[in-house]
């Protein structure tokens, strides 16, 4: 079993790096504002038709464009969901959503969280899925990538006050990165058996003679960007454990690769744009070390089995509860870590049925800020915050002003870094406390004791860190939970983006200083260890007390 797990992890990472390297080169061209070959004419026509100016923006203008697009998208999606019964492509005649569920869903998909307090096949029409959710899957992913484009330019430009043009970046990211790659993945999914149709739900007779209604829909097109954009919201309630979304072992492997593809490629792109590929490899090493350790812990915990079932005399020591037998324990464990290390949230197994330790690791990966590969764009700019913090700590230890890539990290940048890092822990801890203090919060818990608290903590952690997965034993479709989680999702997304853009605006105006004998190298194993230690230290200090009340207490009981 150990050999199989090692081979699975090694194969996954090897194929990932092979695919991400060339994509990283393409992203580096876009960051450097170099059009991809053959796209100049198309871009010129599009920019002229849409009235888009390619004039560069300062950080406030860039941020305003990103926020404006997302707020407009939120409003459009909200009203679309409220009135979906008036819109076409609704063969099941599904009604509009309640105001609180529509708000929660709109915020969820605009913020790249894709938390779902509903069952897709019984709640949303084909039009809502396509024109509403799938469109936001593209736009939310493009927004995250655009923000990291701006931050990378801030590190590599000198004595400037502009960070690029947000509209140009968003168009290029959507047209030349997300759309073609998602199209290829969707075609592969269709070939493997993922649904792509507009048929009404089909009534069939099962082998037992019973009648069953099979849901249909344009699944493959949404499934592709759901994974590539680290969105994670399933077309069906069972998400990627549903055979109509994820029918084969090959589609499952491709889905895992798609989740990590752009976050990995952005690390390669960062190294190229910075003029030192070792900087990108340093980030990949730090992320990969944490990732491999977490996968190993989850695999070990799930292979050991559920001690309560073993005490009752169960034959198997492997915890298969809540898992698809066609995927098994090892693949389910790997997928769980992939989807929570990135801010994806898609699932092929029920995380609520994992063992106490097996469920704690995905929860902790979200709580540290989704920085282990992370979401498209958001993972890298989240990790860059920890890089700045690690550089600051190292500067304190050696008595020098901290600097990164030749740029001095001053008080303003550190205040903004601390603010950005503290946003999501504050939301998680205060949100969980509020839920446990109120009758409306506690009434949604289906399990008592430590596991019930773990379900609450997981839900708020998932929302605040824009992941979207859940411990499913929580009845979250209520006005209290829909509003609480919508607030966590919105502030967790834009409460981090705003200080990140402010940091970018501050750094882009500075000159790069040449390295001296006292400069801390930020590309070697020493800094990799320091960065990992910083991530672990912040995560441990912030969440150990809360985790002790949930999964740790459950494990010890």
Curated annotation (Swiss-Prot):
Keywords: Cell inner membrane, Cell membrane, Ion transport, Membrane, Potassium, Potassium transport, Transmembrane, Transmembrane helix, Transport. Disulfide bonds: none annotated. One of its GO terms (cellular component) is plasma membrane. The keyword Cell wall biogenesis/degradation does not apply. It is a multi-pass membrane protein. Its main location: membrane. The keyword Calcium does not apply. The chain crosses the membrane at residues 5-25, 63-83, 132-152, 170-190, 253-273, 283-303, 329-349, 356-376, 379-399, 416-436, 484-504, 526-546. One of its GO terms (molecular function) is potassium ion binding. It is found in: Cell inner membrane. Belongs to the KdpA family. Part of the high-affinity ATP-driven potassium transport (or Kdp) system, which catalyzes the hydrolysis of ATP coupled with the electrogenic transport of potassium into the cytoplasm. This subunit binds the periplasmic potassium ions and delivers the ions to the membrane domain of KdpB through an intramembrane tunnel. The system is composed of three essential subunits: KdpA, KdpB and KdpC. This is Potassium-transporting ATPase potassium-binding subunit. It comes from Escherichia coli O127:H6 (strain E2348/69 / EPEC).
